[in-house]
Amino acid sequence: MDRYWEQFKTPFICFAGHSGVGKTTLLEHLTRRFKADQIRVGYYKHDSHRFQMDKPGKDTHRCLEAGAGIVTINDPAHFAVIAENPFKKRSITHALEQCDCILIEGYKQSPFAKIVFLDHEGKLPISQEDTGIQAVVHQGVIDNKSLTERGIPLFHRDETDRIYEFVKDYFYRCAAPLYGAVFTGGQSKRMGRPKFALEYNGRSETERMVDLLVPLCDKVFISTRKDQDLGTLDDLTHCQRINDEHTGLGPVGGLATLMGQHPKNAWLITACDMPFLQTDNLAAIIQERDPLRYGTCFMQKDRIGVEPMCAIYEPKFIVPLFESMSRRELSLSRIINDLPFKHVKVQDRFRGNFMNTNTHEEYEVARAKREQETPR
């Protein structure tokens, strides 16, 4: 069995049953529905027999027969890869992790989550004790009362729309727990003083940001440099401190540290220098969160740019993040723009909420404006 599936961060489910029970027909329908809903679905066929995708005599087939480990071909609309088994793990993971979700045909003996098809006599193809069974598809005959007694959902194979909704709901229920983090590790060179210590209405802005995140996230952290003295912020009891392990790389290094230490969690991050950010903004992005994408971020009007420092990053973002970091590509905005993120349009009345303060003059303007408002 291919154990690398256990490490997948993209949700998947197997469709298991004997030949002729309608697996491929159902998967074809589900694929069309996901496509119609603009969900990037992947399909994986686990075949215990040999298969052939190339044609003898073609250039690619000749080179594969000559000993090429990987053969690829592309045209303006498609590409294909045929590889020998030693290349399988990285080839499959790199290809399928880009999808929002994955439908697998096969793996009936695996421990993975699966939808099982009964045969025409209503018999299971695997043990009824299999803990991976999420639902059962039948042809009108069910020869196993324990399925009903255990509360396992039962679908006739013609109930394709109900099965689609069940599968889609299963994928969204796989969403990772959400952690929050306030980034305070910047050098603050233009400000001339640590931005994490700036106060508005007599209160630290970093502490305000922590308080905004606490009711919305399972845990909250302050992301900072190891040599940074946070003063009284270190005494906060409702958040934890995480020191950057990748120094000198800006927010990319901070996020890589967070995701490296907590790889099974999604992250809602904010900066410590956004004095007009409100609870409504954070609640909005959580409500719009799409856990099947690499993340969810705000997009400014007319698509002039994303807001990487008020965004949700899903666990699968760790792969392109570390790849970009290894190439010294240190712009979160550019990484986001290369990936299928969900974009949330910033409402006109909130456009100013994402302004950050980088200089003393900007801070004084923001401080004066905040003093005219009710402290948040």
Annotated model-derived regions:
Residues 2-49, 176-181:
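Walker A (P-loop) phosphate-binding motif
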Residues 31-84:
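N-terminal phosphate/diphosphate-binding loop that engages ATP/GTP or pyrophosphate donors
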Residues 34, 58, 177-329, 337-350, ...:
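Nucleotide and nucleotide-moiety/phosphate-recognizing core
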Residues 43-45, 73-74, 134-140, 221-225, ...:
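Short internal beta-strands
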Residues 51-53, 123-125, 141-147, 211, ...:
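Short, charged/polar "capping" segments at the starts of alpha-helices
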Residues 82-110:
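Phosphate-binding/switch loop-helix module in NTP-utilizing enzymes
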Residues 157, 161-170, 354-376:
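Short, basic/aromatic-enriched C-terminal tail that caps enzymatic domains
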